[in-house]
């Protein structure tokens, strides 16, 4: 009897590890944090972020409207329905061992403002009316802490801006100096030293294998597809499989449709960026953290070089169209996304492809069984 009591204890431990978060309507969570977009110039925007709650918020800015890097902060559409191309970067951040300086503390009823110019990272090539919206989730830690415990959702007002394309073109874009060099000059082979080239080729080759295996699994593993993409229908399984197969196809340094660099030519790496992608150019640049990651992790849902290749591959239009964005990082956030957002989130494909790592999570807990059994006999 005590054995089954102990087994039940293990089951209780396992339940949180394998239970799926319930996807929440992001709009319905828009009461704690509000974001108001205000025009501050011809193409300048001021985002006013307000804590409407009764408790302080400890907010992590990575890949949100508060990000200081030239990232996608707002969705931009033109009145004629034409696609507004994003010209900025999509970074993958290291979320381990976060430090206090990476957070913004927002007291109850307080606001913080962020000013940015949409012309620096968007191709505003048409005259006329543009509509801007911001929607997402910001990771939150306990006040004074650095462990992510939740996310607060935000959905802004729709800001309409009449823009003169010629004036917008005069705004220096974030990466004009770099892109003006041309691909040949941007990729000096001597920068890719033998050690880095070997590591990158190994990551690409194994990412090919992992993504190919995941593409096959997506066709048949209905529950695993539901776990990561919130749908079981054949159409979803087929699309997930197709995208993973395409990601596998671009994971090569030998004449593929995505260019994998060995260096940070644009000089946009920071201490927390693992790698970043320019979707407008189908280019991926690793940072120093990429080389420090393990080739293949044996920890639950941890970042490694193989997963980073799959994640970054999903950001490139030559692999996935439309390219995936960063709606959420990590297992808990990724599996809490709605179906539509999960299908467009790069980390969901990396996590799905590496889902076999869940075995390690279960193994660690099963190893605790003897200790639980002993405890149950006291």
UniProtKB/Swiss-Prot annotation:
Residue ranges the record marks as coiled coil: none
Any one of the GO BP annotations: proteolysis
Propeptide section residues: 20-186
Reaction(s) the record says it catalyses: Preferential cleavage of bonds with hydrophobic residues in P1'. Also 3-Asn-|-Gln-4 and 8-Gly-|-Ser-9 bonds in insulin B chain
Enzyme class: hydrolase
A GO cellular component annotation in the UniProt record: extracellular region
Pfam families with a match to the protein in the record: Peptidase_M35
Swiss-Prot/TrEMBL keywords: Cleavage on pair of basic residues, Disulfide bond, Hydrolase, Metal-binding, Metalloprotease, Protease, Secreted, Signal, Virulence, Zinc, Zymogen
Keyword Cell membrane: no
Superkingdom, taxonomy of origin: Eukaryota
Active site: 312
SUPFAM superfamilies: Metalloproteases ('zincins'), catalytic domain
EC code(s) of this entry: 3.4.24.39
Main location: secreted
Signal peptide feature range: 1-19
GO molecular function ontology, one term from the record: metal ion binding
Cell location: Secreted
Residue sites binding Zn(2+) per the record: 311, 315, 326
CDD domains: M35_deuterolysin_like
Bound cofactor: record note: Binds 1 zinc ion per subunit.
Disulfide-bonded cysteines: 192-262, 269-287
Cofactor: Zn(2+)
UniProt similarity note: Belongs to the peptidase M35 family.
Biological role stated in the UniProt entry: Secreted metalloproteinase that allows assimilation of proteinaceous substrates. Shows high activities on basic nuclear substrates such as histone and protamine. May be involved in virulence.
Name the UniProt record assigns to this protein: Neutral protease 2 homolog ARB_04336
Organism from which the protein derives: Arthroderma benhamiae (strain ATCC MYA-4681 / CBS 112371) (Trichophyton mentagrophytes)
